[in-house]
């Protein structure tokens, strides 16, 4: 009987130990943590943001690059005398009418042709005190100015000389040379480093000593070959002007 009880107790003990071992194994088995799948996104940590480069100025529409490099300056009787509208141009060889009806002179008409052919800017040399409305009286006044060495005051002035590198300079021949208003003009400005291109209208004397006088007045400028036009043919001088400009390489 005792032997039977001992056997039952031993069997119960074995079962109890087996159950405890299973529980321990269950409790000590760690559950792995849940890991979410990685998201495939670009690594931007090393990429700089696209921001405007402050070191570079913003591009703005440039102002006109068509800087007018040519100035067509001229002195003419018709724009320096108190001539009445409708004055008879046939009564004076030095008076001409433009297409718009404004009064100019022989030199002014040639200046218009040069400006149109080159794209240059017209500039009328005007005196503060006008000359007489009679051409003969004007010639006498011009002779008195020359004899006395008088430089007439000018009322027109170039405001932006730096914009021009080529200066056409036109005038009539008065008393075998330039009108004194041209000397006033040359005295007012320093054309050093610029190119002066003279043109003259005359009754047959051409430039006389005008070229050397321009060179003396503006020693720092380059003076090119000039064009002499007879006063009576000024209105029809387009071909002569075109050929001259082409020879100089200044045609537009």
Residue ranges and their predicted role:
Residues 8, 20-21:
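Domain-scale selection of a single, long terminal region
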């Amino acid at each position: 009987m005792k032997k039977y009880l001992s056997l039952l107790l031993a069997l119960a003990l074995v079962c109890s130990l087996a159950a405890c071992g299973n529980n321990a194994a269950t409790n000590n088995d760690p559950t792995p943590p849940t890991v979410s799948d990685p998201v495939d996104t670009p690594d931007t940590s090393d990429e700089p943001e696209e921001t405007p480069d402050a070191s570079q100025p913003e591009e703005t529409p440039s102002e006109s690059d068509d800087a007018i490099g040519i100035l067509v300056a001229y002195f003419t009787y018709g724009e320096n005398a108190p001539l009445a509208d409708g004055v008879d141009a046939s009564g004076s060889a030095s008076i001409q009418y433009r297409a718009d009806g404004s009064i100019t002179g022989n030199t002014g008409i040639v200046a218009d042709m040069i400006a149109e052919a080159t794209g240059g800017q017209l500039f009328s040399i005007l005196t503060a005190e006008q000359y007489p409305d009679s051409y003969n009286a004007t010639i006498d006044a011009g002779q008195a100015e020359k004899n006395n060495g008088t430089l007439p005051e000018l009322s027109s002035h170039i405001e932006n000389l730096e914009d021009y590198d080529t200066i056409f300079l036109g005038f009539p021949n008065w008393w075998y040379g330039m009108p004194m208003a041209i000397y006033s003009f040359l005295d007012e400005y320093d054309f050093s480093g610029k190119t002066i291109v003279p043109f003259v209208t005359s009754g047959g004397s051409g430039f006389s000593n005008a070229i050397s006088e321009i060179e003396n007045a503006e020693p720092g400028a380059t003076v090119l070959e000039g064009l002499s036009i007879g006063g009576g043919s000024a209105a029809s001088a387009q071909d002569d002007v075109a050929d001259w400009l082409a020879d100089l390489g200044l045609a537009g």
